[in-house]
Swiss-Prot record:
The protein's role, per its UniProt record: Displays ATPase and GTPase activities.
UniProt binding sites for GTP: D94, V95, R96, S97
UniProt entry keywords in alphabetical sequence: ATP-binding, GTP-binding, Nucleotide-binding
Lineage: Bacteria, Bacillati, Actinomycetota, Actinomycetes, Mycobacteriales
Region (Disordered): 1-26
GO MF term list: ATP binding; GTP binding
Similarity remark: Belongs to the RapZ-like family.
Name of the featured protein: Nucleotide-binding protein Mvan_2698
């Protein structure tokens, strides 16, 4: 929906909500009585905001694109109205909005007066991936102007740095397919409760670089490498022989016990600070054996806690 169209609808008190009927209809019949869940979708241009919005829409969220801040507040008021069935609102915001960072702060402050704390989903990707995507689509960057594409991307990254720092969930789409991005968003937003904590345990290979979205990184290259065992080399850390080999090494189980205890403390602290998402990265040389086995084992231990845990093997299959 266009910004102008939404403005017209809110002024008239009706209108269409995408292809699903009018705003007036969307605000009636059988909604939640206790409030509305709000997610602000933002991030770097070309990083996948549109895909994220489509996934949220498929999950049943009411999605609006590039609304002025005051209309976001009005949409929330519709959701708070008695009988409203708008219980989940996702708004896509980008740097084409004038005074973007100030607008985002205003929205947060305004919604706080309604006892609503909006979550911020921030999507990003590496510079080389963004350049490749823009070149493939033959599009110009919204901040490019008379500059080069790389300069436009750099300007946007600098502008959005404060937003990224305060985001609830950061997803780096550099190495994600559309399917993998959809899976990440579905796991984060499908059927969650407000107080739930979502933990992603991600294995990776140092030879391919650090995960940009990791909250904490642990190196398990202190363990012997199954790559040098002929019978284990073709398999991955998901194979029981490789897993048994890795976990059977001196110090492996002690590491898991200690790291699990440390994460319990960290996760409790994040909960107190209102952070609902955490990515724990575990790395080895190639992301095939040790980090995969340790990530699987750690995720199993975390499942015993009151957490939603998923495992992501970023570099599995790259060798």
């Amino acid at each position: 929906m266009t910004e102008q169209g939404m403005h017209q609808e809110l002024r008239e008190g009706a209108g269409t909500a995408g292809d699903e009927g009018g705003l007036e209809a969307a605000a009636m019949d059988g909604g939640a009585d206790n409030g509305i869940d709000v997610v602000l979708v933002t991030g770097l241009s070309g990083a996948g905001r549109g895909t994220a919005a489509k996934v949220l829409e498929d999950l049943g969220w009411y999605v609006a694109d590039n609304l002025p801040p005051e209309l976001i507040a009005q949409m929330v008021d519709l959701g708070l109205a008695a009988g409203s069935r708008i219980t989940q609102l996702a708004v896509v915001m980008d740097v084409r909005s004038r005074g973007f960072t100030g607008d985002l702060d205003w929205v947060r402050t305004e919604l706080a007066t309604r006892n609503i704390v909006p979550r911020v989903l921030f999507l990003e990707a590496s510079d080389d991936i963004l350049v490749r995507r823009y070149e493939q689509n033959r599009r110009s960057h919204p901040l490019q102007g008379n500059q080069t594409l790389a300069e436009g991307i750099a300007a946007e990254r600098t502008m959005l740095a404060p937003v990224r720092a305060s985001a609830d969930l950061v997803i780096d789409t550099s190495s994600l397919s559309v399917h993998a991005l959809r899976d990440s968003i579905e796991r984060a937003f499908a059927g969650e409760t407000v107080a739930h904590t979502n933990v992603t345990v991600e294995s990776f290979g140092y030879k391919y670089g650090l995960p940009m979205d990791a909250d904490t990184v642990m190196d398990v290259r202190f363990l012997p490498n199954p790559h040098w065992v002929d019978r284990l080399r073709p398999n991955t850390g998901q194979h029981h022989e490789v897993r048994d080999y890795v976990l059977g090494q001196p110090g492996a189980l002690e590491f898991l016990d200690s790291y699990h205890q440390l994460l319990d403390v960290v996760i409790d602290g994040y909960r107190r600070e209102g952070k609902r998402y955490m990515t724990v990265a575990i790395g080895c040389t190639g992301g095939k054996h040790r980090s995969v086995a340790m990530a699987e084992a750690l995720a199993e231990r975390l499942q015993d806690s009151d957490l939603t845990v998923r495992v992501l093997h970023r570099d599995l299959g790259r060798e």
